[in-house]
């Protein structure tokens, strides 16, 4: 039984889901739905972890990572460490549609965006400046992502230098994802034609080291889509999760016959075998419109589903 069109979205980002659904229910394209949904979160600054004015880096700057994938062509567009451009997922789509590349990063991705007609503007807000200044001056740069450097990053701000001799201590988990700090929007859609698309958008980890790129823009990590199978998206501690390509793994598990929920579980277990306490979740959607999710390191994980069988969106919450 085919259930399409359908869109699933990480966390309780219902406005983004509704926007994507508006595109899909009128026979629109999955790719457009994912981009439009992402734009909503970038503009609404979903939980301050998507879009401008959130998650300042060590220097106080907000930079964006985004990704979009077309499961009908296997084409990808991605941007990382994007500076001074609000609409990261749209820039990612421009990389896909106006270049033969897949991925642009940093200052020169900004140059490309400006050439493509995007407006350059500061991504900082009063709120992000205040958050940063508290971290820098009241909290002595705690928490941060440094290790094996001097001065001791657990007590002091930089500039840091590497320690000559060090014992690699277990760094406390800095990246806390909970219902107040959702770190990424991830979205997977199947349209009425059966085309699959997936995408992500995020401003990354709060107080990240400048230049840090998370899992969101990495194909197969943040999201993945393949018309012959379905799609998946991931959210959580990107530094850890990207090493396991969970979205790719979930799609491959579905290819081998696993249900979306079991496929997501396998992807999560592959990570938790090495990092039992990592925080994250994977959502998966088959080309026929079956869906499921799995999570780790938080108590529960909500995701949004919208399809023809529902009058409005439904927030489905699973236990981790």
Swiss-Prot record:
Entry comment on modification after translation: Cleaved into an alpha and beta chain by autocatalysis; this activates the enzyme. The N-terminal residue of the beta subunit is responsible for the nucleophile hydrolase activity.
Residues modified by glycosylation: 15
Catalytic reaction annotation: N(4)-(beta-N-acetyl-D-glucosaminyl)-L-asparagine + H2O = N-acetyl-beta-D-glucosaminylamine + L-aspartate + H(+)
Active site: residue positions: 184 (nucleophile)
Single GO biological process annotation from the record: proteolysis
Keywords assigned by UniProt, alphabetized: Autocatalytic cleavage, Disulfide bond, Glycoprotein, Hydrolase, Lysosome, Protease
CDD domains named among the record's database cross-references: Glycosylasparaginase (cd04513)
Disulfide bond positions: 41-46, 141-157, 295-320
Cell compartments where the protein resides: Lysosome
Top-level taxon: Eukaryota
Enzyme class: hydrolase
InterPro entries for this protein: Ntn_hydrolases_N, Peptidase_T2
Molecular function (Gene Ontology), one example: N4-(beta-N-acetylglucosaminyl)-L-asparaginase activity
Keyword Cell cycle: no
Assigned GO CC terms: lysosome
SUPFAM superfamilies documented for this protein: N-terminal nucleophile aminohydrolases (Ntn hydrolases) (SSF56235)
UniProt-listed Enzyme Commission number(s): 3.5.1.26
Annotated substrate binding sites: 212-215, 235-238
Major place of residence: other
Entry's family note: Belongs to the Ntn-hydrolase family.
Role this protein plays: Cleaves the GlcNAc-Asn bond which joins oligosaccharides to the peptide of asparagine-linked glycoproteins.
Subunit field text: Heterotetramer of two alpha and two beta chains or heterodimer of an alpha and a beta chain.
Name the record gives this protein: N(4)-(Beta-N-acetylglucosaminyl)-L-asparaginase
Species lineage: Eukaryota, Metazoa, Ecdysozoa, Arthropoda, Hexapoda
């Amino acid at each position: 039984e085919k259930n399409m069109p359908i869109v699933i979205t990480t966390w309780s980002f219902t406005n983004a889901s509704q926007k994507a659904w508006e595109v899909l229910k009128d026979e629109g394209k999955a790719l457009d739905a994912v981009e439009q949904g992402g734009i909503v979160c970038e503009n609404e600054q979903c939980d301050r972890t998507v879009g401008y004015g959130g998650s300042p880096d060590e220097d106080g700057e907000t930079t964006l990572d985004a990704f979009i994938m077309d499961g009908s062509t296997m084409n990808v567009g991605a941007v990382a460490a994007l500076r001074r451009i609000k609409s990261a997922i749209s820039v990612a789509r421009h990389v896909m549609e106006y270049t033969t590349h897949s991925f642009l990063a940093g200052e020169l991705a900004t140059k490309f965006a400006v050439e493509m007609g995007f407006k350059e503007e500061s991504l900082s807000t009063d709120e992000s400046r205040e958050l940063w200044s508290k971290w820098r001056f009241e909290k002595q740069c705690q928490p941060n992502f440094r290790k094996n450097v001097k001065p001791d990053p657990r007590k002091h701000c930089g500039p840091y230098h590497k320690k000559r001799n060090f014992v690699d201590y277990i760094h406390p988990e800095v990246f806390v994802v909970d219902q107040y700090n959702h770190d990424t929007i991830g979205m997977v859609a199947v349209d009425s034609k059966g085309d699959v698309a997936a995408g992500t958008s995020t401003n990354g980890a709060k107080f990240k080291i400048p230049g840090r790129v998370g899992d969101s823009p990495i194909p197969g990590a943040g999201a993945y889509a393949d018309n012959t199978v379905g799609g998946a998206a991931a959210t959580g501690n990107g530094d850890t999760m990207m090493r396991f390509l969970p979205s790719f793994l979930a799609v491959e598990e579905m290819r081998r016959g696993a249900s979306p929920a079991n496929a997501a579980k396998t992807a999560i277990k592959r990570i938790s075998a090495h990092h039992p306490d990592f925080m994250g979740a994977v959502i998966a959607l088959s080309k026929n419109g079956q869906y499921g999710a799995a999570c780790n390191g938080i108590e529960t994980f909500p995701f949004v589903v919208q399809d023809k069988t529902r009058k409005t969106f439904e927030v489905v919450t699973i236990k981790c």
